[in-house]
């Protein structure tokens, strides 16, 4: 597979505009809608039931509404069972009463999570993300000069924020499993970026007279086929899980679907371009400083 040489740096401002738009859309959605946090983070009760005769999600929603349970999450599994999730403060007995009004059913599973436990999980989730980002920054700082580490961590934060924003826009449930998948996406994204950075570092040693922008163009072009092939494989695998994996795997694989696309684009158009523009900015600042007499 051969691809024509592309001047990626030439088009970096277009990628910046797209990235800024996606970040603003994500921020707007997070501010106005927030996230559909699962019971792991909010506390509550999950009931999984099997009706003797098939019922629709709308029937269950309507029955719950009649007993004044308006914020329940109702899902259908691949096997036709119904999952009902209610927040802390709602009574499971009312849910069973509502379900009984529809028809006979068998309770397959019940899971209760207290508000104290969910609060601790929220704190741990935030610290997990912060620790991961700081750890990656330290790793990149040791492996490369700080300029590359900064560009890599900014691109990574960009990827994670857009993935979280996608969950807000679609209002898909965010559980501990989803959080784990987002951290996996972060690892995949930074690995993709590191491959490009390695090639840039190698070319800087081999082609010392070449401008940094040309070095970046050359390095990205040398890796583009590998990046596309790897990303396509992960994307297609994630798509299969999303389409045929059921509700739980669907929510998890959604992070991979969005993360692979955003991470691939950022490793090609954003991370290395940020390194170049930060370096240019620092040079301008240095020139503007008054020289000491």
What residue ranges belong to the model's regions?
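A structural signal for conserved, well-ordered secondary-structure elements
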Residues: 1-293
């Amino acid at each position: 597979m051969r691809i024509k040489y592309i001047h990626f740096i030439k088009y970096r401002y277009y990628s910046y505009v797209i990235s800024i738009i996606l970040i603003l859309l994500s921020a707007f959605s997070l501010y106005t809608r927030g996230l559909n946090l699962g019971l792991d983070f909010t506390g509550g009760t999950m009931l999984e039931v099997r009706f003797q005769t098939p019922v629709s999600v709308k029937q269950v929603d309507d029955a719950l509404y009649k007993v004044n349970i308006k914020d329940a999450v109702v899902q259908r599994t691949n096997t036709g069972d119904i999952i009902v999730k209610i927040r802390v403060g709602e009574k499971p007995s009312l849910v069973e009463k509502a379900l009984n009004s529809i028809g006979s059913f068998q309770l397959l599973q019940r899971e209760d999570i207290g508000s104290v436990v969910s609060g601790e999980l929220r704190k741990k989730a935030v610290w997990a993300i912060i620790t991961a980002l700081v750890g990656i920054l330290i790793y990149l700082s040791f492996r490369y000069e700080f300029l590359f580490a900064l560009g890599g961590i900014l691109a990574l934060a960009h990827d994670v924020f857009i993935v979280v924003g996608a969950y807000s826009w679609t209002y898909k449930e965010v559980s501990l499993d989803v959080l784990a998948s987002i951290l996996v996406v972060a690892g995949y994204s930074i690995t993709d970026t590191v491959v490009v950075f390695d090639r840039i570092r190698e070319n800087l040693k081999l082609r010392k007279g070449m401008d940094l922008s040309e070095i970046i163009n050359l390095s990205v072009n040398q890796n583009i086929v590998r990046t596309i092939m790897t990303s396509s494989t992960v994307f297609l695998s994630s798509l299969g899980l999303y389409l045929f994996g059921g509700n739980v795997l669907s929510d998890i694989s959604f992070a991979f679907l969005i993360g692979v696309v955003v991470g691939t684009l950022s490793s090609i158009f954003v991370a290395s371009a940020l390194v170049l523009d930060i370096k240019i900015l620092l040079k301008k600042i240095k020139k503007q400083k008054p020289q000491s007499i």
